[in-house]
Swiss-Prot record:
Family: Belongs to the PsbH family.
UniProt-recorded name of the protein: Photosystem II reaction center protein H
InterPro entries named among the record's database cross-references: PSII_PsbH (IPR001056), PSII_PsbH_sf (IPR036863)
SUPFAM superfamilies: Photosystem II 10 kDa phosphoprotein PsbH (SSF161025)
Amino acid sequence: MATKTIESSSRSGPRRTGVGSLLKPLNSEYGKVAPGWGTTPLMGVAMALFAIFLSIILEIYNSSVLLDGISIN
């Protein structure tokens, strides 16, 4: 066979580490969703501002609307 299964009876369970003990409280909230809209409006505002920022950068790159009145030597 191409695959080989090795069963080890020496492992009794997951190993405890210092980092794991520190991060366990953060993982205890996994899967829980706060009721209501939460921070969705804030994310919407951030996305709108980012879209405006990208459009300004694109206009500068294309030398279109923002740079019409500026002469470049």
